[in-house]
Amino acid sequence: MEKHQYRDLQLIGQGSFGSVFRAQDVESSKIVALKVVDLDATKDQIETLTQEINFLIDLNSVHITKYYASFVDGFRLWITMEYCDGGSCLDLLKLSGTFSERVIAEVMRQVLEALVYLHGQGKMHRDIKAANILTMKDGLVKLADFGVSGQLESLRDKNDDFVGTPFWMAPEVVKQTGYNYKADIWSLGITAYELATGEPPYSGIHPMKVLLLIPKHSPPSLERSKFSRAFCDFVSNCLKKNPKDRATAEYLSKHKFIKKYCPNTSVKEVVASYAKWKESELLPEATPYNSTMGNSANTIDEVVWDFGTVRR
């Protein structure tokens, strides 16, 4: 397999360590997503990229982006993945700034299905946020970008690696005291907060300072005057400082907040509205492959502290 098997490459965003393109497989005519990584620019991160590829091979859930193949061309690693045609939840937030509780509940329901599967397999995501939750035009929601995901060993209940994105990190991850799958639950709660308010807690503060605040302060909470009791309780169940006190994905999937609204067609409706909005706004077309790859190393450097909804 080589890059010539793909045509019509259009830059659609930035992923872990590199650029992400929409492309068409010449043989199957299938539209795919290509993550292209400049190995010269990421020599110290190749091990993590290899981990991502091996991790994705084993996954089999409708709510997790599918992995197809990978190959090296020159100094670039190409990873072929499922293309999600609805955009990320971060993209969809551009339409209205926030999601209604009905939409949030449906997103959470589907992400929780992915987490029930992952955690049941002894695996975790470790970087859940709106930018890593992708959608399809039919309303399907999928977890993506497992660049920092890891597999929990059967006889080991914690991990000391410092991974994730600062604003969404659980206290125990920041403190590096060891963590397990409950770190995903914290990130899920922060993501629910992000979808409801348009940005994660501490968004106006420099990421390095946030790393000091997360373990020091009480868990974030939603304003009860603005949100339903059920939603506030759902988020509260996710954002317990002690991981042992946090709910499991299985428990949260049956929470009254989820049962109140789900299942529903709200995600499909938002995706359709977003597509119409993009068309009416005449947003710039995706950037062709040839005009972007020449400075891919610079592109990677420029997005080091780009955390999506965080405003500067």
From Swiss-Prot:
This is Serine/threonine-protein kinase ppk11. GO terms for molecular function: ATP binding; protein serine kinase activity; protein serine/threonine kinase activity. PROSITE patterns: PROTEIN_KINASE_ATP (PS00107), PROTEIN_KINASE_DOM (PS50011). It comes from Schizosaccharomyces pombe (strain 972 / ATCC 24843). ATP binds at residues 12-20, 35. It is an enzyme of class 2 (transferase). GO terms for biological process: intracellular signal transduction; protein localization to cell division site; regulation of establishment or maintenance of bipolar cell polarity regulating cell shape; septum digestion after cytokinesis. Its EC number is 2.7.11.1. Keywords: ATP-binding, Cytoplasm, Kinase, Nucleotide-binding, Nucleus, Serine/threonine-protein kinase, Transferase. Residues 6-258 form the Protein kinase domain. The active site is at residue 127. One of its GO terms (cellular component) is cell division site. Belongs to the protein kinase superfamily. Ser/Thr protein kinase family. It is found in: Cytoplasm; Nucleus.
